[in-house]
Amino acid sequence: MEMKKKINLELRNRSPEEVTELVLDNCLCVNGEIEGLNDTFKELEFLSMANVELSSLARLPSLNKLRKLELSDNIISGGLEVLAEKCPNLTYLNLSGNKIKDLSTVEALQNLKNLKSLDLFNCEITNLEDYRESIFELLQQITYLDGFDQEDNEAPDSEEEDDEDGDEDDEEEEENEAGPPEGYEEEEEEEEEEDEDEDEDEDEAGSELGEGEEEVGLSYLMKEEIQDEEDDDDYVEEGEEEEEEEEGGLRGEKRKRDAEDDGEEEDD
């Protein structure tokens, strides 16, 4: 597949301005030159063109935000000065497996002031005597050559290396994600537990008060019922007494009349 078609495929219905990473490995460069890549990819930070039969960087567009460039397994032999002009913020450059033979070719990379890591594996230049010492002396801005620093310490993973410049932002994000300091959640939990205990105490007090009110209410009602019954009994007793009095009065009047009748009979 030609590079131009590969780019259109990798866009995936996005505009070039939205693309930050672009992988064009194993496609075909017509006449060994870059095709289909232009200045509209202004947000591009990572570009990979490995094994695409690339021989010239002359048509590389301006990519000011580009930080990582993969150009391994091509047939590039020179013209590296274009990189400093078009990609001034490069931090990582992989030229492994190309046709780079001389230190003079690599010298053009001195103007890449932000370059930290350079790979030249399987290039003829690696066969030079004191190759590593010469490269570190020539390109004093780089920290890692072919994956190791001058003390033979291995370079970190590419992702960690890519994040070096953004460590401060990452720390801030981690702090935000970490949330409140240690002990803060425990204090909150203790406060919540205290609030819950207070609520429970209030509920218990309320329930006790409710029970007391119920007891008072029941006793009051019972007293009222008893009083009503007593009043009813008094009313019944009073009624019976009145009836007895009336009956007694009637009997007295009868006796009086009987006595009067007896007196009249004696007079006769």
From Swiss-Prot:
Residues modified as N-acetylmethionine: M1
LRR repeat windows: 18-38, 43-64, 65-87, 89-110
Transmembrane intervals: none
Organs and tissues of expression: Expressed in peripheral blood leukocytes, colon, small intestine, prostate, thymus, spleen, skeletal muscle, liver and kidney.
UniProt-annotated location(s): Cytoplasm; Nucleus
UniProt keywords, alphabetically: Acetylation, Chaperone, Chromatin regulator, Cytoplasm, Isopeptide bond, Leucine-rich repeat, Nucleus, Phosphoprotein, Repeat, Ubl conjugation
Name listed for the protein in its UniProt record: Acidic leucine-rich nuclear phosphoprotein 32 family member E
Source species of the chain: Homo sapiens
Lineage summary: Eukaryota, Metazoa, Chordata, Craniata, Vertebrata
Gene of this entry: ANP32E
